[in-house]
Amino acid sequence: MANSLCFFSSPPTFCFQSPSKNPKPSHFFSTNDNTSSLVQKRELLQTSRSQSFEVKAANNNPQGTKPNSLVCANCEGEGCVACSQCKGGGVNLIDHFNGQFKAGALCWLCRGKKEVLCGDCNGAGFIGGFLSTFDE
């Protein structure tokens, strides 16, 4: 079966077929050629397929989750977020608490794990999770 790509614009309209059959563009509807018959044009119309694309999703919600979703918008259902002190690096960036936790040592908050529990869902990954006090 030959694949074809057709352009419908002001006359003449061209149809490009796959290289296996005919690599040259052929007239789909000829403007000044009276030798082609209506049967040939109808056959070409019936064998060619057109595809249309339809947008099914749009980026209306900047947080990335549905507005009525149970999934936590802060952690996106993971239950943990990047550590706010080390920015996900696992080590202290500066000295903390009068030098008790030195820069370059394991992070004092996440202890080198690079992630901490989400504060919005308490690590559950969904709104109304474990020990949550948020009610609507």
UniProtKB/Swiss-Prot annotation:
Pfam families: BSD2_CRD. Zn(2+) 3 binds at E78, C80, E115. It comes from Arabidopsis thaliana (Mouse-ear cress). It is found in: Plastid, Chloroplast stroma. It comes from the Eukaryota. Keywords: Chaperone, Chloroplast, Metal-binding, Plastid, Repeat, Transit peptide, Zinc, Zinc-finger. Belongs to the BSD2 chaperone family. This is Protein BUNDLE SHEATH DEFECTIVE 2, chloroplastic. Residues 1-56 form a transit peptide. One of its GO terms (cellular component) is chloroplast. GO terms for biological process: chaperone-mediated protein folding; ribulose bisphosphate carboxylase complex assembly. InterPro entries: HSP_DnaJ_Cys-rich_dom_sf. A zinc finger (CR-type) spans 62-133. Zn(2+) 1 binds at C72, C75, C118, C121. Interacts with the RuBisCo large subunit (RbcL) assembled as an intermediate complex made of eight RbcL and eight BSD2 subunits. SUPFAM superfamilies: DnaJ/Hsp40 cysteine-rich domain (SSF57938).
